[in-house]
Amino acid sequence: MNENSYWQKRNLQREKDINKQALHVENVLLRAYTQAQSYLTDKARQLFKRMQTASGLTEEQARYILNSSMPPETLVELQKQANQIDNAQLRKEAQNRLTAESYKFRITRADELKARSYIAAKQVADVQLQAQTEFYVDVIKKSFGQASTEIFMRRARELRRTAQFPVEVWNKETAYELTYIPTQQVETILNRKWLGSNYSKRIWGNTERLASKLEEMFTVEALTGKQEIEFVKELQAEFDTSFNVTRRLVRTEANYIHNQSQLEAWQKNGVKQYILIAVHDLRTSEICKKKDKQIFSVSEAECNGENGTFPPFHPWCRTVAVAYFGKHTLNGTIKALDPVTKETFDLPRGATYDDWFKKITELHSQDEIDATYKKIMASLKYK
């Protein structure tokens, strides 16, 4: 295995590791969303059970239920839930909401259900913020470490090539890793804004939208004419929508943080250029197809969506940036995947997405390619 193949293998393995970690985070968040949904579904069923109607609530019935008084002990229960939120800012927001309710002359059932919805959304945000922060910190440390290691090893190998005496500087059988990155740099990458926001602000925004949507569901207007089964389905739809956004955020932010960590290592170690590497498969976006193998100066790196020079370029973006050390970076061949047969074939390392797709069209008819694309998209749980 030559040096370029070695580092390509390391980079591919890093991508797989990040995706595996992301899947674990998504499963943690799915449990949090499912728990919150089950909790509010149970409260909704209790609400409908009071009227025992099979034809949907009338406006009068909905108004009667929502305007009835909330038992005093319920506020104590909600305050306990709010106090259990770990994140200080989220906990304060939940406590402030309940404080505002306590000042009212009479707290209605509508007030209670809206407060429950708000706290449930904050509990989800609490789990999400903790899980994603831990994930991203790990991505930063490992991606920065691997990028630094690659720079060190490539330069050491160049030293060996030009030295007047034998120097042992690289052993491909050893998994070298330079992992140290100052805490301040970790925080800088973690909180860096792109497209006007950062990961924590996007979590807040998504869960605030969920809270708002849930509160709207517990109004006279929303409940009038509703049957229990219909209401429960709408509740599930709101949670599904929010969770789909969450999955997109987890993956897109992971791509951003991985690439930013590498960029930090390049800037620190004087790397001058990088090259964009798009995934060669049928899911790749038109944006990333065009950017594949483009080379930029590190000083030009800008994460600005489709108009930027550094990934991610769009939601769910899988394109990565790789340090470019000159034409020899693209020497040799790579194993490319045939999406129709699932077999591999050789391509020049510098082959673009268009080069790969041209080879696929030479091997298969357009009908075969279209059918494969439909199967791939149908197999995805979330589009």
Locate the predicted segments by residue.
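N-terminal leader/targeting and assembly helices and adjacent pre-domain segments
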Residues: 1-226, 230, 328-383
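Short, well-structured alpha-helical segments that form the helix of a local strand-helix-strand
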Residues: 230-236
